Regions:
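A residue-level marker of the well-folded mature domains of exported/periplasmic proteins
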Residues: 27-189
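Short, low-complexity disordered leader/linker segments with a strong preference
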Residues: 1-32
Length: 189
């Protein structure tokens, strides 16, 4: 359920972020190219990277643009992956997650004519970088609400892969939804 909600949110955000691009696509002689750089885990991680890629694939089909991805096995791959897409003249390069912020900033500063976007980071203040931020607590509220309604034990929980601001927001939303649905519930974290 969470994966489907995240895929829908990412798809909508990516489509919205590139919705102003049809004019650019129509004016270009070459096909508009969008590249996605994953965090570690790759496009088959069953989580954030995969949802981002699936959303971008859908956006590519709907907008008629070329999409591709490069997987990062380690953080040492971030910068070389950026350089690959820049060297191949990609029009928009999307970084999946705040862990790619430094590499995105460096690539954007060195390539001011290339457009970049980064998911879940708003620390880069450059004219060629767009931050794609989501309200994780809103989607997780719905998941928590459903969990609160369907539990048979009044005892539920959730696990996050790491502790950061986005995961904390997810947890707050999940707990709020569960408690609103079932005031007698206990939420394990």
């Amino acid at each position: 359920m969470r994966k489907k909600v995240m895929a829908a949110v990412l798809t909508a955000a990516m489509v919205a972020s590139v919705s102003a691009m049809p004019q650019m696509v129509a004016a270009a002689d070459d096909e508009f190219k969008i590249g996605l750089i994953t965090d570690v885990g790759g496009v088959n991680d069953g989580s954030f990277n995969q949802s981002a890629w699936e959303g971008l694939e859908k956006a590519g089909e709907e907008l008629g643009v070329e999409v591709n991805y490069l997987e990062s096995a380690t953080d040492a791959d971030y910068q070389p992956n950026m350089e690959t897409f820049v060297d191949e003249d990609y029009d928009l390069i999307i970084s999946v997650g705040y862990m790619l912020a430094d590499a995105t900033r460096e690539a954007a500063e060195a390539n001011p004519d290339t457009k970049f976007a980064i998911i879940d980071d708003s620390s880069i203040d450059l004219p060629n970088v767009t931050s794609l931020m989501f309200k994780a607590e809103q989607a997780s509220y719905l998941v928590g609400y459903v969990a609160g309604l369907t539990t048979k034990t009044n005892n539920i929980g959730f696990v996050v892969g790491m502790t950061n601001e986005t995961m904390n927001q997810f947890g707050y939303g999940y707990c709020a939804g569960a408690i609103d649905a079932n005031p007698d519930i206990t939420v394990q974290q």
